[in-house]
Amino acid sequence: MPGLFDTLNLATRSMQAQQAGVTVSGQNLANINNPAYSRQRVNLQTSDPVPLVGGIQGTGVEVAGIQQIRDGLLDNQIRDEGSVGGFWTTAQSALGNTQTELGEFLNGTAAASNGSANTSSTASAQGLSTQLNNLFSAFESVASDPTSLSQRQVLVSQAQSLAGSFNQIATRLDGVNQNLNSSVSNDVDSANKLLSDIASLNSDIAKTEAATGSTANDLRDLRQQKLESLAQLTNLQTSTASDGSLTVSIGGVAMVSGSKITDTLQAYDPGNGQLQVRAAVAGTALTLTGGSIAGAIDTRDGALANLRTGLDNLASQLIGKVNSVYSAGYDLNGNTGADFFTGTNAATIGVNANLANDPSQVQAAGAAGSVGDNTVALALAQLAQQANGALGNQTFSGAYAQTVTDLGNSLANANDQVANHDAVSSMLAQQRDSVSGVSMEEELTNLMTYQKAYQASAQIISTVNLMLQTVIAMKTT
């Protein structure tokens, strides 16, 4: 039959098991505000029994292991949703900055119709839409009073303001474009740093788990945090090896395999000044569909490029159409053949420098020496209402309104996508918190349970100690 020392060992093992429980609960409570931490649980099991003549004698309890409470599927969903959020948050920010630089406030519901500029986008007082209207109004004012130098001076000033706005917008859009290129470059560097961290954690996890036979819970938490940070930069795929390490692939190219970095991301210029991303070792151009890197590239090459193309086309057509009519006109001195606008696009459009110094050189008449002739000025004013095939059969104002509308729709879509992501992300976070989060009430209850069990085990030891003293006293008498 079992002796007192067997009972003493049983109680000692019980105290050790309860102490492990207290330690784990303490670890959970210490990390209650750590968003990367997943709750841990001590798993207890009956220790191996001892066969006796009279039957089987239990030996108490022991720690089977410390389990990390995680839902792998939920973790993957959160990681993937992070890529969605990274993409659309970057797009939203870039499009919002573009709206600011354009000088128009967009609500995303504007729609150009009948070639007019009447849309539900709200133009600022000095926006391009207003200045286009001011230009053609100034042509009309010259036509109404063709001998007035002051009206001609107003026309030149309005044209200079319009050209200056085109120039400023082009410069600002270049700045947005450069910022997106910088974002791509910086995010690629950040992604490579995270890949290096993940490879290092893979090594630590594999070594720790091989040496201890236990799951490296805290290291796995940190690796998951790194993966989620990486997913915000780019979409990725993972697979788990038998030693607990991960293989991380981006765009179909393995970047990390166990403790080794097999490839890295590289931002490169394909020759057009617009950074793209490839695998540095494999040399493969990567098609990224999620994360902030893809969001920056997609916005830059999509909505921003379309906006710039639309503005350049508008400026080019304005220059060409106005100059075509204007160059056939005559100024107050009988001169003809000069152009009104200079340049070829939004960045280079300007006004004939001679006109600023001498508004009498404005060519408003249809024939030389015809005092009061407004033929050309009137024809120029009428350009405002003429549909242009190169502008999608829209007027100048209508084409600009459509360009603004397209940007507004892109921004509205990005806003919707970010709102949807926030809702999904919040729901997933709540689900994970219910699984892996630390509950203070639960841990305090566990602490009390472990404490009482520990005290009970200590009482067993005290009782056995008294019994041993009795036995010893009997043998000494």
What is the role of each PLM region?
Residues 1-477:
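Structural signature of extracellular appendage/secretion-system components
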